[in-house]
Amino acid sequence: MAQKRSDIPTGSPTAAALEKMETSATNLYVQQMLLLGALEERANRRLRDLKLILASTGLSLRDLLPPAKIANTVLAEGGPFIDVSNMSDASSAFFQHANRAGLIVDELNAVEDLILHIPLSSPLTVSRRFTSGFGVRRDPFTGRMANHFGMDFSAAWASPVTATAAGRVIYAGQRTGYGNVVEIDHGNGFVTRYGHLHRITVRIGQRVDIEDKVGELGSTGRSTGPHVHYEVIYKGKPKNPRRFIEAGRYVFEG
């Protein structure tokens, strides 16, 4: 028959050994809770920063991730006091805390994977000059006001033009107005376009990573001089590339 705790004489070697074991278990529990808390805090801070950065592009996380991959943000801090001497309640609290931290870390991993496929880089990594922005401008050929659904960057002739996120090449050839142009599908509704290239260095169907070379800067098509015309398209609609490039500076610095 197992001996009850109440039957063990106070001050006996057995009682001392049990007390030491309980103290060790309590200390271990406290250390685990502290580690979980630190993990959750770091993940929450990084997740919060990435959400703010994505918001600066004009999009929210709910636009980009399925609901199943977004942690329940209602899960906040607080709750009843649970005495660690009651290990049954303490164990329950530990598993609840671990589950909450796990949800947040899973969401962070999903967001960081998503970031790899959002065009947040610049199409030129060499020294360049911004020459024309997104929106209404005076057309350089006709002098009339017209929409410009991209950004223009000038640089040295044949400078490498690079992919602004991982993706798959869906077009590599000539288009009216664009000259030699490359289009990349990044998934999640994002497509980027690189126009007026001197030379194309990728083929349709090719997978590319961020900053992989897709062509060389040139002046083909409707162009007044060497530059790359760069577009960001989300679900078929043009977006201002500047917002994505500026957001990317914070992502890659982080």
Where are these regions (language model features)?
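Catalytic cores of peptidoglycan-degrading enzymes
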Residues: L108, H117-G254
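Non-catalytic extracellular/periplasmic "stalk"
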Residues: M1-R129, G133
